[in-house]
Amino acid sequence: MQDKKEMQDKMEEREALIDEVIEREWEQFQYVQNEGGRASCQDDHETFVIMRKSQFMNWTQELQESYRQEPIEAEAAHWNLLTEKYARMMESTAPERYAELADILPKRSKERIQMQEEMIAQQIRWEEDFAAKFPGVASTGRVIHTSEDTPWDTSIETYARGEISTYSDRTVGLLKKLYDQLAADHENLSEKTLRNMTALYGYESLEEAEKQQRARLER
């Protein structure tokens, strides 16, 4: 009975940690300046929470606690991590604008960039496998590859590169450890994230979401 209570307490503690991180991110997201004016997604709190929670639920507690410090440290330094993330994405989607911002972005070492690129390559493999297995659900999301980017459509690869580049070395090291463990166990992080997401949207399962989406596409 005690073990069950301790487990429940730990689950509630982790959920509270995730919620705290998401709300800090949401607060920073409100101050991101979009060149075309305020984006509609900046007013969609529910979707933001589901997207971020789906990702963070897969992280180890050590990784969650490491990343938890980053928006706090950024706020103390008057730095917006969400603005940095979208600025880094512009290296692919808006290179001229990115060139104007590049000098103010934190610099990353060659070793750090190499580690990031290894992780992104693994994520792309997961995304490609997921799209082959669940094409209906995959069709509702972003395109996969940076080569598919346009000024209006940012790929999963470019988004991942932008986000991972904002993390501290500490968090990147822990995330790399998670990626390596999942790959060794033949688990697909993209599929795990989408299972979380479809559950949070109220579907019985990812398979049920795929079935419904395929039916829509066939109409």
Enumerate the predicted regions with their spans.
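Compositionally biased, intrinsically disordered low-complexity segments enriched
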Residues: 1-11
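C-terminal structured interaction module
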Residues: 154-196
